[in-house]
Regions:
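Short, exposed beta-strand/loop patches in secreted or surface proteins that constitute
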Residues: 41-47, 68-70, 97-102
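A cross-taxa feature marking solvent-exposed loop/turn segments within ectodomains of secreted
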Residues: 37, 62, 116-118
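N-terminal signal peptide c-region/cleavage motif recognized by signal peptidases
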Residues: 13-15
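Short, non-transmembrane alpha-helical segments in secretory-pathway proteins
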Residues: 19-41
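Mature extracytoplasmic domains of secretory-pathway proteins
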Residues: 48-89
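C-terminal partner/receptor-binding element of secreted or periplasmic proteins
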Residues: 94-129
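Positively charged n-region of N-terminal signal peptides that target proteins for export
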Residues: 1-4
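Sec-dependent N-terminal signal peptides
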Residues: 6-8
Length: 129
């Protein structure tokens, strides 16, 4: 009697526990937190070379406000990106520090101020698409 040896490749898969979060989603959440606006009005214009460009229209006067941001570790680096005032990257020690974290299906944005105080806001990932 001949024996047949069957070789079956084993494939191991690991479940994905963390959500895939884009720089655009983080930038929209950070903009809402920093400027005290509803995250639902934040619009992602584009992502180019790891930099997200986001804007919103201010309701009371219809003006357009825009920023660009990039992620450096858990920090959100940002600069204004308005046609008449393209600003500097907020990386001076006197600037507030904006950090992000992912908690399940939420993005948590924490802004740490130079006086030691901070504010924290949470946004549902699915509303930042």
């Amino acid at each position: 009697m001949k024996k047949l040896l069957l070789l079956v490749p084993l494939v191991f898969t690991a479940p994905v526990h963390a959500s895939e979060v884009t720089v655009g989603q983080v930038c929209k959440a950070a903009s809402a937190a920093m400027f005290g606006r509803d995250h639902k009005i934040m619009q992602l214009d584009k992502v180019e070379s790891g930099i997200a460009y986001v804007h919103y229209i201010r309701q009371n006067d219809g003006t357009r406000w825009a920023i660009k941001c990039k992620l450096v570790g858990d920090q959100v680096m940002w600069a204004s990106d308005n046609p008449d005032s393209i600003g500097r990257w907020r990386d001076d020690p006197a600037d507030s520090t904006v950090k992000y974290a992912i908690d399940g299906k939420k993005i948590i944005i924490t802004e740490l101020y130079s006086d030691g105080s901070s504010t924290t806001n949470s946004y549902p990932l699915k509303q930042l698409k």
